[in-house]
Swiss-Prot record:
InterPro entries in the cross-refs: Restrct_endonuc-II-like, tRNA_endonuc-like_dom_sf, UPF0102_YraN-like
Full protein name: UPF0102 protein CYB_2119
Alphabetized PANTHER family for the sequence: UPF0102 PROTEIN YRAN
UniProt cross-references to Pfam families, sorted A to Z: UPF0102
Gene3D superfamilies for this protein: 3.40.1350.10
MF (Gene Ontology): nucleic acid binding
Family the entry assigns: Belongs to the UPF0102 family.
SUPFAM superfamilies from the UniProt entry: Restriction endonuclease-like
Species assigned in the record: Synechococcus sp. (strain JA-2-3B'a(2-13)) (Cyanobacteria bacterium Yellowstone B-Prime)
Amino acid sequence: MDPLPRRASLQNTGNVGEGWVRQYLCQQGWQILAQRWRCPWGELDLVAHKADVLIFVEVKTRSPGSWDRGGLLAVGIPKQRRLIRAAQAFLSQHPHLSELSCRFDVALIERRASREGVSYALVDYLPAAFEIC
């Protein structure tokens, strides 16, 4: 099997999952400031603002029964460090946001395939999933 189509398919799956979380956050009153923001230390899936809080959201889209508990185990200490560094880079480019309280959230999206097609659902949203140590 050619890895390029699979990679494109996985990337599209991730994009759809991020879209679901983006919609969820907007419904909760959050203003999306960035999606798939990249820097040398990594990527921030979503950055959003509401009141005096800035959130950096890591989105994991998985099929049921995935090895990493729906994506949760994929956000281990090394990934958290990369997200923190990326958030610091984001704040250095947007200093007007640096006075806000910052939070790291994780959103878990489930992708189900059936004969009728593919469906997505927000399984869990974990505010303050990890803290800066």
